[in-house]
Swiss-Prot record:
Its EC number is 5.4.2.10. It comes from Corynebacterium jeikeium (strain K411). GO terms for biological process: carbohydrate metabolic process; peptidoglycan biosynthetic process; UDP-N-acetylglucosamine biosynthetic process. One of its GO terms (cellular component) is cytosol. It is an enzyme of class 5 (isomerase). Keywords: Isomerase, Magnesium, Metal-binding, Phosphoprotein. One of its GO terms (molecular function) is phosphomannomutase activity. This is Phosphoglucosamine mutase. Belongs to the phosphohexose mutase family. It catalyses: alpha-D-glucosamine 1-phosphate = D-glucosamine 6-phosphate. It holds the Pfam family PGM_PMM_II. The lineage of its organism: Bacteria, Bacillati, Actinomycetota, Actinomycetes, Mycobacteriales.
């Protein structure tokens, strides 16, 4: 068995790579590993399990839940719900673990499984390694009689508990703000529009009718052009786009311009510093964040700490350094006072609260930073592990960095979830970024 866990749990084509038997084994192994790390004190251990609405979700939820129950864990099934809600409910219910069945922004045929430890935090790499090892040595039998775990339906008030929680994060009513929210026909479809309405916004919800098959189908945060058009059509103050599991948020201003995760973080960092809420005046971002954001933060007296890609690594740095804000260009934003993972709904609420507080349009708030032109090319490869050390790639990177000097940067890295190698170039003008990225991508493709 090859390595299962990527940067965001286990992910793959449902019923091909990610099968029901595999989900059952994962559930059983995770139950054994995570429960062994918690002081359950003789009580029955519990796990919160949620999913997005794609067609394979019910199958995988049933299989994973059966695996957990086979090891004596009571499963609290919270139904279709955002990933950050599962993280919150894991803590709110006092559960020993949480699990989200979702492939996030991936197409409908894919699915994934991501785990949360007690308290709602994503697992560390060493714990994931232990789960994989445990899968290879699972016993044939498990607890019997009353010691077998139960699968309990806890979906009736799960969403309401989450909405009540995120609603406490803002102090400014959103009255008068008209927002179009693209729910990607995913887990945000009920949660995000309702959260924004409860806060006072005038909400136009689009792509909010999941039917098991239409999640991420030409909509949501990976198809932002759909939202750009809708914002102009509805004459809205802004638009917010979520992905399939609602852990990310991208925005569009009233003029139809995209406001990405870097810009959202810059807006929130300046706001939190102004309000005395930005611990150590420091923001956590990843190596993929735009150089323009880092320059803007420096100009505003805010330090930027960098991590590798993945909101789990952003969170790890937030915890290790006792910081309050971090995230990714893709729209995963973590506000550590209120969340343990990226939360698209919370991000949208907080962004609109800043608009309400200042009375400024999103376009003006976003001008806090100048986005350096960036080109990202995803190159399909046969073996991600050999690219970075290939002599041709090393030489091409050195030449590109020499050409750019201090006016840009180059970053090559493997995808954590797909057989791709990502080539990213930032430069002073779009043409230069495209030209250099194209050359690098061609070299990578030849390896």
């Amino acid at each position: 068995m090859g390595k299962l866990f990527g940067t965001d749990g286990v992910r793959g084509l449902a019923n091909k790579k990610l099968t029901a038997p595999l989900a059952m084994k994962l559930g059983a192994a995770a139950a054994r590993v995570l429960v062994s790390k918690e002081e359950v004190g003789g009580r029955r251990p519990t796990a919160v399990v949620g999913r997005d609405p794609r067609v394979s979700g019910e199958m995988l939820t049933a299989a994973l839940s059966a695996g957990m129950a086979s090891q004596g864990v009571d499963v609290l099934d919270v139904g279709v719900i955002p990933t950050p809600a599962v993280a919150f409910l894991t803590d709110d219910f006092g559960a020993d673990m949480g699990v989200m069945i979702s492939a996030s922004h991936n197409p409908m045929p894919d699915n994934g499984i991501k785990f949360f430890a007690a308290g709602g935090r994503k697992l560390q790499d060493d714990v994931e390694d232990e789960i994989e090892a445990t899968m290879l040595e699972l016993p044939e039998t498990g607890p019997t009689g009353a010691a077998i775990g139960r699968i309990l339906d806890e979906s009736s008030d799960a969403l309401e508990r989450y909405l009540a929680h995120v609603g406490t994060a803002i102090n400014h009513p959103l009255d008068g703000i008209r927002v179009v929210v693209d729910c990607a026909n995913g887990a945000a479809s009920t949660a995000a529009p309702e959260a924004y309405r409860q806060a006072g916004a005038d909400v136009v919800a689009i792509h909010s009718r999941p039917n098991s098959f239409n999640i991420n189908d030409g909509v949501g945060s990976t198809h932002i052009e759909v939202l750009q058009k809708a914002v102009l059509e509805h004459q809205a103050d802004l638009g917010l786009a979520h992905d399939g599991d609602a852990d990310r948020c991208l925005a569009v201003d009233s003029e139809g311009n995209v406001v990405d995760g870097d810009q959202i973080m810059a807006i929130l960092a300046v706001a939190m510093k102004e309000n005395g809420e930005l611990k150590q005046n420091t923001l956590v971002a990843t190596v993929m964040s735009n150089l323009g954001m880092k320059l803007a933060m420096r100009a505003n007296g805010i330090k930027v700490l960098e991590t590798q890609v993945g909101d789990r690594y952003v969170l790890a740095e937030l915890l290790a350094s006792d910081l309050s804000l971090g995230g990714e260009q893709s729209g995963h934003v973590i506000i550590s006072e209120h969340a343990t993972t990226g939360d698209g709904t919370l991000t949208g609420l907080t962004l609109m609260a800043r608009m309400a507080q200042t009375g400024k349009p999103l376009s003006e708030l976003a001008s806090v930073m100048t986005v350096l032109p960036q080109t990202l090319i995803n190159v399909p490869v046969a073996d991600k592990s050999v690219i970075a050390d290939d002599e041709r790639v090393v030489e091409a990177i050195a030449k590109a960095e020499e050409d750019l000097g201090d006016a840009g940067r180059v970053l090559l890295r493997p995808s954590g979830t797909e057989e791709l190698f990502r080539v990213m170039v930032e430069a002073a003008d779009p043409g230069t970024a495209r030209r250099i990225a194209g050359k690098l991508a061609a070299v990578v493709a030849e390896v």
